[in-house]
Structures are given as structure tokens and as C-alpha cells.
């Protein structure tokens, strides 16, 4: 099985473009690939899934223990013919000024070879020096080959012998610049897959170009590894409760692994759209409002008053609810759109969502619960991450968050039926799915007792 990590010296090198092109090309070659993304990013896995339906998941060495990452990899890679893991940021760049949760740490944890994506613009011999530095920075870098991105055929033919001689690494090919296949960006990184016109056509052009300019035989020889040992599937519970999950263009940041954990815990997930639907699904015993871009759809969310009222009444009535980041903003009083206009929201929580114009409390942190609640026990902590350009006038204070000795804050609203806050939670390997489903089951029993 071909298994490898796509990494680069720095952000903006075209890792996602190359990864999507590779996945599409592997799919064309009948390899049935699956993809992983290093780190907490939501958008890149959405892109991976848009490439001819390729399965994609997150692997995060900050949010998850090494054994959990290995088990997730083995579980989701099973049955596929190739695995492509896309790194984040620069190869060694992790949490703070460390390699923790970096693409290198993921490659090291999984013992996978690395294909280094390099943009050669403005350098030649210096590229060799930079690559040498990356190779020798750690005793085992796992770097096995080089791919040139945004490179002409003429430049490739000049650089290939130079780089191979100076680094000892094979240069496997290049991806030429294709102006007709450019993917635009957004404030969380790349735009979401559903927003880009002719996405399939653009990725098809990239795949064709890469397939024609890649040494597939060498790539296969460098990346062939035994398939990971299968992991016994977790025992499925049968709680018999329905949990409504918001899923549309405003709420699109839910980890596939989190949803799988909820299913394993016994929940039946029912998807709905706070933008388009007029009311919540029937017979639900829980509500999950993940993150996304509600600020970009504040007007249609606000104008859908029947849905706002339904959610407000349900949450205030004790429906077990989890609202992360964008979902948290939706539960507030108002939410400013990109122009600064404030639109009424569900009105469950006291804060107002406001545009800040810069990243707010960005990155990984450690969150500790102050009291028992739907998802947490008092004193329990969880690794979390935040990434948002909007803030709230009231972020809550039911959790303590520690980022460093100098950077700490309080946030979140928690009760025996609610978690709401900016922090994104990663549920895998934690008791959170079981507790959420248990809360839904308790709510279901209460409803039945009330109706009897």
C-alpha cells in the first residue's frame, strides 16, 4: 500500500493543491485512496472529500495521544489502496515554537515517508541548502523525495539534477502553474469546497498535469508500506436517541471522527439546515451546532425566525445541546455580518457576536471545567483549539483556559444540558460522546415520563 505524508518548508507552498491533485490522480489510477489532514483544520478534509468522494479525516498530535492517532489511522486506512496525509504549516512547525503536532511529528508517529513540496521561484542552489537543512534538522526526518510546485518544465529540467546531486533525494516531478485552476482563499484558509465554481474541473486539470509530470514508479517504490494492522471496531451501543446536527454552508465544521464517535455511542444523527429548514427534526433528544461561517450567513440565519425560535425554545427547555464556535455565536443575542450589521440570533446566551477583523485567541490550549456539566466533570481538562475572527461580548466563564504562563482566560457556558463556547472540542478518545448520548437518553426518559 502506498502511504506517505505531503509536507513543505512553509505555509503557502501549495500542499493542499498538490494533495488534491494526487488524490484525484490516484483515484483515476484505480488506487481507491483515502486522505488525512495533520492538525485541527476543517477545510482541507472537505476538499479531500470533494475529490471524487475520497474519504478524509483529521489526525492531530496535540488533541490526541500518539496511540489514538495510530488507531485512527489504521481504522480509516483499512481497505484502501493508498493513503495520503497532508501536513500543516511548515514541516517542523507545531504548537508554539515546538514540533509538537507538526507534520514531522505525525510522520514520525506513523513512521511514514515524506514527499516534500517545494516552490522553486526565486532560488536554485539555495533550495538545495534549505532542503538539506530540513533533512538533517532531526536524526530521522522521514523525507524521502521532492516534488516541485508551480514550476515550468524548463526550470524542472534545470533543478532536478542539481537538487538530486546536492541532497541525495529523488525529485519525483513537478506541478506546473495552471492559472485556470487557481483555488481562492478565505479567512480560515482555503474556501470551502461548496463555494468554488468548477471545483471538480479545476482539480481534474491539476490531476492531469501532475499525472503527466510525476515519476509514479519511483513514488510507489519510495512509499510502499505494509497495510496498517486492522483495529477491532468499537462495540456499537444502542441508546436509541436521535441527535440533530446542523450541517449547511453556515455550519460545516464538524469532525467526521466526532460524528462517528456519537454513532458508536448509540446516537442516530439527523442532519438539518438552520439556514433553509424551518424547524428542528422530529423526535430529537440532542442538538449539535458545530462551527462554520455563520457570520457570512447572518442575514438568512436571522430571517429564518421559525428556526431561531425553535432552537431557542428547545435549548431553554433543556434539550442537551453542544454549540462550538460558530454554533456558540448562533445562540447569542445578535451577530454582526462582514459589513458590521447586527442580526438577531437565537437569543439563548447573553453575548453579542462582533467582528474583530483579526484572529482572536488563535491556536491550541488546555481547557479545564470548573463544575460538573453535560460533557465535563469538575476539574477535568481537555485539549482544545480556537480559530476565529469574530468575538462575543460575553464569552462565558465556566471553563479556565491555559495557553501559556502569560496567556490564560475564562470562557464557555456549561450546565447539565449545555456546552457552548468558542473552543472546538475533539471528541475522539474522550468520554464526551458517551456523556452527550447519556444526557440525550436522560432527556428522552424525562419526555416520556412527562407524556405518560
PLM feature segments, named:
Residues 294-372:
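Cysteine-nucleophile active-site neighborhood
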Residues 112, 169, 316-320:
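A short helix->loop->beta-strand "cap" motif at the edges of active sites that frequently abuts
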Residues 1-2, 236-242:
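A short, charged/proline- and glycine-enriched loop
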Residues 2-110, 118-142, 150-157:
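ATP-dependent carboxylate-amine ligase catalytic core
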Residues 107, 212-213, 237-239, 251-261, ...:
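C-terminal and late-domain segments of enzyme folds
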Residues 37-38, 171-179, 268-276:
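Beta-strand->loop->alpha-helix junctions that form or flank phosphate-binding loops
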Residues 124-235:
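Internal gly/pro-rich beta-alpha loop/helix module
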Amino acid at each position: 500500500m502506498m502511504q506517505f505524508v505531503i509536507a513543505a518548508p512553509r505555509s503557502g507552498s501549495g500542499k493542499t493543491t498538490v494533495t488534491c491533485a494526487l488524490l484525484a490522480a490516484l483515484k483515476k489510477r484505480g488506487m481507491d485512496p483515502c486522505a488525512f489532514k495533520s492538525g485541527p483544520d476543517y477545510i482541507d478534509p472537505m476538499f479531500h472529500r470533494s475529490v471524487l468522494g475520497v474519504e478524509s479525516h483529521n489526525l492531530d498530535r496535540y488533541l490526541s495521544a500518539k496511540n489514538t492517532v495510530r488507531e485512527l489511522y489504521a481504522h480509516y486506512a483499512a481497505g484502501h489502496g493508498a493513503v495520503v496525509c497532508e501536513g500543516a504549516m511548515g514541516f517542523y512547525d507545531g504548537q508554539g515554537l515546538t514540533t509538537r503536532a507538526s507534520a514531522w511529528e505525525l510522520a514520525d508517529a506513523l513512521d511514514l515517508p515524506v514527499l516534500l513540496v517545494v516552490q522553486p521561484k526565486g532560488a536554485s542552489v539555495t533550495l538545495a541548502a534549505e532542503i538539506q537543512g530540513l533533512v538533517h534538522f532531526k536524526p530521522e526526518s522521514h523525507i524521502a523525495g521532492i516534488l516541485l510546485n508551480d514550476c515550468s518544465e524548463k526550470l524542472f529540467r534545470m533543478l532536478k539534477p542539481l537538487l538530486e546531486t546536492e541532497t541525495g533525494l529523488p525529485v519525483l516531478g513537478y506541478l506546473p502553474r495552471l492559472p485556470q485552476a487557481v483555488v481562492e482563499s478565505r479567512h480560515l484558509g482555503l474556501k470551502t469546497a461548496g463555494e468554488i465554481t468548477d471545483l471538480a474541473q479545476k482539480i481534474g486539470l491539476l490531476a492531469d498535469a501532475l499525472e503527466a509530470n510525476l515519476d509514479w514508479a519511483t513514488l510507489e517504490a519510495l512509499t510502499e508500506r505494509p497495510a496498517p494492522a486492522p483495529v477491532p471496531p468499537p462495540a456499537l451501543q444502542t441508546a436509541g436517541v436521535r441527535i440533530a446536527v446542523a450541517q449547511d454552508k453556515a455550519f460545516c465544521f464538524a469532525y467526521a471522527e466526532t460524528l462517528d464517535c456519537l454513532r458508536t455511542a448509540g446516537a442516530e444523527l439527523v442532519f438539518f439546515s438552520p439556514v433553509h429548514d424551518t424547524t428542528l427534526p422530529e423526535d430529537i433528544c440532542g442538538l449539535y451546532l458545530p462551527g462554520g461561517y455563520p457570520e457570512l450567513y447572518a442575514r438568512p440565519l436571522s430571517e429564518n425566525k421559525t428556526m431561531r425560535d425553535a432552537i431557542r425554545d428547545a435549548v431553554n427547555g433543556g434539550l442537551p445541546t453542544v454549540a462550538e464556535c460558530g454554533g456558540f455565536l448562533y445562540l447569542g443575542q445578535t451577530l454582526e455580518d462582514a459589513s458590521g450589521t447586527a442580526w438577531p440570533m437565537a437569543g439563548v446566551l447573553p453575548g453579542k457576536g462582533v467582528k474583530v477583523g483579526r484572529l482572536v485567541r488563535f491556536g491550541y490550549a488546555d481547557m479545564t471545567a470548573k463544575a460538573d456539566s453535560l460533557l465535563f466533570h469538575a476539574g477535568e481538562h481537555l485539549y482544545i483549539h480556537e480559530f476565529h475572527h469574530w468575538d462575543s461580548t460575553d464569552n462565558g466563564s465556566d471553563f479556565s483556559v491555559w495557553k501559556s504562563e502569560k496567556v490564560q482566560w475564562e470562557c464557555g457556558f456549561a450546565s447539565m444540558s449545555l456546552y457552548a463556547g468558542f473552543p472546538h472540542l475533539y471528541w475522539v478518545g474522550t468520554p464526551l460522546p458517551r456523556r452527550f448520548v447519556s444526557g440525550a437518553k436522560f432527556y428522552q426518559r424525562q419526555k416520556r415520563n412527562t407524556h405518560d
